[in-house]
Amino acid sequence: MLKVIFLSLLLINLGLAVETTHDPEFEKKFQVTHIKEGDGKTFPKKGDRVSVHYTGTLLDGKKFDSSYDRNSPFQFTLGVGQVIKCWDMSVARLSLREKIKVICPYNLAYGERGAGGVIPPKADLAFEMELII
C-alpha cells in the first residue's frame, strides 16, 4: 500500500514538473520574470484567438499603453503577424492565467522607426502580460 502511495505521489510530482517547465534559453534572451504561474496545461497555438491583459513601458518605466486602463484585454490571432514579433513569441509560451514580465528587444518590437510618436526609434520595451484566454 505504501508503495502505491509513493508511486502515485512520484507520478504527480513528475507531472507537475513537466507542466511548469519553462524555456531557459528564451527566458534568458528576453529577461523573463514570472509574476504568476498559469495552469501549466493550456497553451495557445498558432491561429488561436487569444486575449491578453498587459501593460507596456519603456525601459525607464514610462507607461505607453495598458489594457488594464481600458478594463479590456487585447485580442489577437496568435502567430499571424497581427502583433509585434516579441508578443507572438512570448504569448505562445504562456499557459492560461500565467503572468510574466518580458523585455522585448527593439528589433522584435517596433524596430528602427519606433511607433506613433510614443515609442522612440530602437526602443527596447517591457511588457507585463497575462494570458486570459
Regions found by a protein language model. Give the residues of each.
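Cross-family detector of peptidyl-prolyl cis-trans isomerase
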Residues: 2-133
